[in-house]
C-alpha cells in the first residue's frame, strides 16, 4: 500500500526531493472546480505523481480543492497565491490547466512568463478541452506553449474511457483485420445543463453546448475510425455539416429558471444553443471516405449524464452507453432525501429505478488520461494527444458553427476560419421562437 503524502513528509521525503529525483511528478492545478476535482478523483489510480498545488482566482476555492486532494490522499497539495508562484516552486514539475475557457490564454501567458523570467522549470503542460474559445485563441495557446519548449498534452477524457479503448481495440483486431476497416462512428454527450453560470454565457464560454461538449464527440469519432497505432492524421476531416438549436432553455419558463439559478444568465437576450449535431466526412490514408456523426445536448433529461459511442464496419459493430453501468438502485416514493449527484453526474432524480456509475473518474476516462500524461512527462510514453490535436478540434468546432449559421455543408477548413467567431459567442444569435 503506497504511503500517503503526509507520511512521506514525516519521513523526510519532501515534495521537492520527490519531484527533482525524477521518480515522481509534482503536479499543480490551474482551476479548483468540478473538472479539477474529477481529475483528483482519478488520481487515486495514478502512480509516480502527486497533486501538490492548486491555483484559482478565488483563494477560498483553491484552498478547498487543495484540502480535497489531501483528503483523497493523492498529494500534499497546497493553495498558491498566483500561477507564477506555483510555477516557481521546485516541487511543481507539470501544470494541469482546468479553469474556465475565457481565462485560457491569460493562464498560459502567466505560465510562460514565469518560465521565461527564470522563476521555475516545468516538464510539461496538460490542458483541458476545449483548447480555447476560437481558432485564434487556440493558436495563441499553442504558440505560447511551444515558445517555452514544453512537452504538452490535450486532456480529452473520453478517448481514454475503458469501454471506448477496449471496444476500439477489439473491433480493429478482430473485425477490421478480416472484413475491412470501419466506416461509421457515432458519439454523443447529453445532460440537462452545466453546473456554473459561465458555461451558459456564450461570450465567456465561446459558444453553447457545441463548444462545451461536442469537442468530446468530434475527437472520439475520429479516434474510433483511426487504426490503433496510427496517427489521427491518417483520418482527415474534409467536409462538415452541422445544426444548432435552442430546444428547451429558450422556452419562457426555462429562461426564468436560468435567471433565478444561474447568476447573470439571461436567455431572453443572449441565448446559447442547447443542442447540436454534426456529420463529418473523413478521408483515410487508405483511400476510403468514412463518416462521423456527433450530437450533444443540454436539453436531455434522463437519470443523468449519458455518454454514448458506436463504431460500425462491414461485419461488426460496437455500442457503449455510460448509463448501462450494471448497478441499479430502486427507491420508492417513501424514500425522502436531498437532491445530489451521488449516483451519476448531472443526476436528475433520487427515486425510482436509477443507474449508478460506481467510479465515474474511471468510467469517463479521467484516471487513464492522467496516468498516461504523467508517464509522458516522466519520459516513459509519447503523448497520444497534444495541443496540436486540440487546435484541430477547435477548427472542426468553428467550422461546425459556420456550417450551422450558413445552413450548408462546408469544406474543411473553410477560408477565414482564424477570424471566425460564432454568433452565439458574439451575442447575436437568435434561435427560432419557443412557445407562445
Name every feature range the model reports, one short phrase each.
Residues 8-12, 247-269, 277-279, 283-286, ...:
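C-terminal glycine/acidic-rich active-site capping loop/insertion
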Residues 195-202, 348-352:
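The feature captures the short pre-catalytic strand/loop hairpin that immediately precedes
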Residues 16-19, 69-74, 112-124, 173-178, ...:
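Alpha-helix termini
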Residues 197-304, 388-392:
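Rossmann-like dinucleotide-binding domain that binds NAD(P)(H)
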Residues 18, 75-146, 163:
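Beta-loop-alpha module in the N-terminal Rossmann-like domain of NAD(P)-dependent dehydrogenases
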Residues 126-197, 215-218:
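A contiguous active-site-proximal alpha/beta segment in oxidoreductase catalytic domains
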Amino acid at each position: 500500500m503506497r504511503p500517503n503524502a503526509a507520511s512521506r513528509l514525516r519521513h523526510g521525503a519532501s515534495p521537492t526531493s520527490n519531484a527533482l529525483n525524477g521518480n515522481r511528478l509534482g503536479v499543480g492545478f490551474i482551476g479548483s472546480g468540478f473538472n479539477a476535482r474529477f481529475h483528483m478523483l482519478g488520481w487515486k489510480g495514478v502512480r509516480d505523481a502527486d497533486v501538490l498545488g492548486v491555483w484559482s482566482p478565488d483563494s477560498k476555492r483553491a484552498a478547498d480543492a487543495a484540502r480535497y486532494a489531501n483528503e483523497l490522499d493523492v498529494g500534499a497539495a497546497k493553495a498558491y497565491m498566483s500561477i507564477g508562484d506555483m510555477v516557481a516552486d521546485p516541487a511543481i514539475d507539470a501544470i494541469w490547466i482546468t479553469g474556465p475557457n475565457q481565462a485560457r490564454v491569460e493562464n498560459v501567458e502567466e505560465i510562460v512568463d514565469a518560465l521565461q523570467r527564470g522563476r521555475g522549470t516545468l516538464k510539461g503542460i496538460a490542458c483541458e478541452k476545449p483548447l480555447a474559445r476560437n481558432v485564434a485563441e487556440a493558436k495563441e495557446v499553442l504558440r505560447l506553449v511551444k515558445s517555452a519548449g514544453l512537452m504538452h498534452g490535450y486532456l480529452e477524457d473520453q478517448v481514454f474511457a475503458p469501454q471506448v479503448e477496449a471496444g476500439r481495440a477489439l473491433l480493429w483486431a478482430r473485425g477490421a483485420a478480416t472484413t475491412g476497416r470501419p466506416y461509421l462512428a457515432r458519439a454523443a454527450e447529453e445532460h440537462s445543463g452545466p453546473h456554473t453560470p459561465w458555461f451558459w454565457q456564450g461570450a465567456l464560454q465561446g459558444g453553447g453546448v457545441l463548444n462545451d461538449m461536442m469537442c468530446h464527440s468530434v475527437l472520439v469519432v475520429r479516434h474510433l475510425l483511426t487504426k490503433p497505432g496510427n496517427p489521427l492524421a491518417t483520418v482527415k476531416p474534409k467536409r462538415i455539416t452541422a445544426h444548432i438549436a435552442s430546444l428547451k432553455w429558450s422556452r419562457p419558463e426555462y429562461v426564468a429558471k436560468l435567471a433565478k439559478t444561474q447568476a447573470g444568465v439571461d436567455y431572453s437576450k443572449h441565448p446559447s444553443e442547447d443542442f447540436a449535431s454534426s456529420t463529418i466526412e473523413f478521408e483515410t490514408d487508405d483511400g476510403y471516405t468514412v463518416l462521423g456523426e456527433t450530437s450533444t445536448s443540454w436539453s436531455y433529461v434522463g437519470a443523468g449524464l449519458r455518454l454514448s459511442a458506436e463504431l460500425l464496419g462491414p461485419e461488426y459493430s460496437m455500442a457503449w452507453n455510460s448509463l448501462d453501468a450494471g448497478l441499479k438502485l430502486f427507491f420508492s416514493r417513501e424514500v425522502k432525501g436531498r437532491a445530489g449527484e451521488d449516483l451519476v453526474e448531472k443526476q436528475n432524480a433520487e427515486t425510482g429505478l436509477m443507474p449508478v456509475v460506481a467510479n465515474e473518474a474511471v468510467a469517463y476516462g479521467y484516471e487513464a488520461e492522467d496516468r498516461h500524461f504523467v508517464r509522458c512527462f516522466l519520459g516513459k510514453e509519447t503523448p497520444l494527444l497534444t495541443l496540436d490535436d486540440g487546435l484541430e478540434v477547435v477548427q472542426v468546432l468553428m467550422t461546425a458553427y459556420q456550417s450551422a449559421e450558413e445552413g450548408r455543408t462546408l469544406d474543411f477548413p473553410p477560408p477565414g476560419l482564424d477570424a471566425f467567431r460564432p454568433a452565439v459567442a458574439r451575442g447575436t444569435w437568435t434561435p427560432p421562437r419557443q412557445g407562445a
